[in-house]
Amino acid sequence: MGGCCSCLKESQDDATVLPIAENEREAVTSLLGYLEDKDNYDFYSGGPLKALTTLVYSDNLNLQRSAALAFAEITEKYVRPVDREVLEPILILLQSHDPQIQIAACAALGNLAVNNENKILIVEMGGLEPLIEQMKSNNVEVQCNAVGCITNLATQDDNKAKIAHSGALVPLTKLAKSKNIRVQRNATGALLNMTHSGENRKELVDAGAVPVLVSLLSSSDADVQYYCTTALSNIAVDESNRRKLSQTEPRLVSKLVVLTDSPSARVKCQATLALRNLASDTGYQLEIVRAGGLSHLVKLIQCNSMPLVLASVACIRNISIHPLNEGLIVDAGFLKPLVKLLDYNDNEEIQCHAVSTLRNLAASSEKNRQEFFESGAVEKCKQLALVSPISVQSEISACFAILALADNSKLELLDANILEALIPMTFSTNQEVAGNAAAALANLCSRINNYEKIIESWTEPSKGVCGFLIRFLQSEYPTFEHIALWTILQLLESHNETMLGLIKSNKEIVKSIKRLSDINYENAQKASSLHSRLQQVNGGSVASGSEQYEHASLELYNITQQIMQFLN
């Protein structure tokens, strides 16, 4: 506290020498005593606070400086919730035109703003307005401390909207371009703190922050790069912002791709997350590939950092959605690394993104499908199908359903004993998993020239294909009933005598088909009658709901009739 004590001594500067009132002399004497033994005093109440407040309200500039410096040192060492009586004199000092006082007062307020309760109270007491004024100062130290305080205040959710609407964003954006690295770090950190809600992100974009953030991606300072990449990643969450970015920031993607190779792990991760968010849009999905992003991402999904692996596999998952990217991703060598990611049993998010990407790639060309099988993806997915979390099972079942659509994949899947996984998956309590698995099973029963694997699995595992059909026929869920009926029709249309015999001889299957035939005939009749009445009442216009219900019932009824022709 040497600086503070020296300021409490008499100054020889004529401009600051004013008569000192008796109460001020007493305050100086008391304060010196308190500071000598400061660990034993509470400076936020009683005598110490009274002495400081007396100096704050003095007309003597030296005494005001002493108070400001004392507050700066005390608040740096002792941070806790304080009341209005403590903040009020600091806010008074903040309005001073003296740079020394401004620097110390901003520092004191910034120190106290580490505490959440203080953050709220500072803003409630009008602390933003003088801080904004100090940000406009020509003094770099004043700028740095004022922005640092705003940065701390902006970490409190209750304050963010108030800061966004206070007029602080424009000067913050201006200071982000400062040549002083400390000011720049504080300003970009404050801008980052303002990107955690959609409304605040809009205010930030409107304040012109985006071009500044993009330009600073090329900064040589890792902290500034991190703040800017993270802020842009958050801004890119919003579709409207992504549209603006695509129209105004042509170099954004190439800069982010470069940063995915940054020596700083956190910059690398945030750049990848920013690309992932941008890749929610089809235009960016193509642009990232054109900018050379694949060669970086294929390395990242094989690195040892779980956050980086997660960010990169989420990014490639979004990129793989675009059909034009599928072949390029396969050619870039992603298949085997993606299959290896399925071993992340302690991170279902990584597994989900990996399977989802594999599903997108498997659905493309014959060449990609062949490489998919050769990569070991089917076997690995089969191993995980019954033991992974529901979210992963959902992706795996969807992947199987897509693969089973291709005629030239069906026998390969059956030879891989895929039914060992698919049939038990139809038992899942999760409708999406059960439905996807059933759809895959139905597709595998359609248009194949060898039904040996289907026949072998008629009763096993888990009561086999037969058990699946009975459960779905009796599910009273139209989608599942439709899948079961369509599967039976495909099996019958194969004209395989063994298959026909297995279905005809199963009384429960035949009984369930007849029941669905009767129910859907009756439902179609009722829907048709309602349809006619509604036409009469409404003068020809009909509610679409009754019409759709009639069509659905008719479709199920028609399938049952086609099946009955085979059975009779």
UniProtKB/Swiss-Prot annotation:
Protein encoded by which gene: VAC8
Keywords: Lipoprotein, Membrane, Myristate, Palmitate, Repeat, Vacuole
Any GO molecular function: protein-membrane adaptor activity
SUPFAM superfamilies given in the database record: ARM repeat
Top-level taxonomy: Eukaryota, Fungi, Dikarya, Ascomycota, Saccharomycotina
Name recorded for this polypeptide: Vacuolar protein 8
Organism: Eremothecium gossypii (strain ATCC 10895 / CBS 109.51 / FGSC 9923 / NRRL Y-1056) (Yeast)
InterPro entries per UniProt: ARM-like, ARM-type_fold, Armadillo, Vac8
Superkingdom field: Eukaryota
First and last residue of the signal peptide: none
Membrane topology qualifier: Lipid-anchor
Lipid tethering residues (N-myristoyl glycine): G2
One term under GO cellular component: Myo2p-Vac17p-Vac8p transport complex
Record-stated family: Belongs to the beta-catenin family.
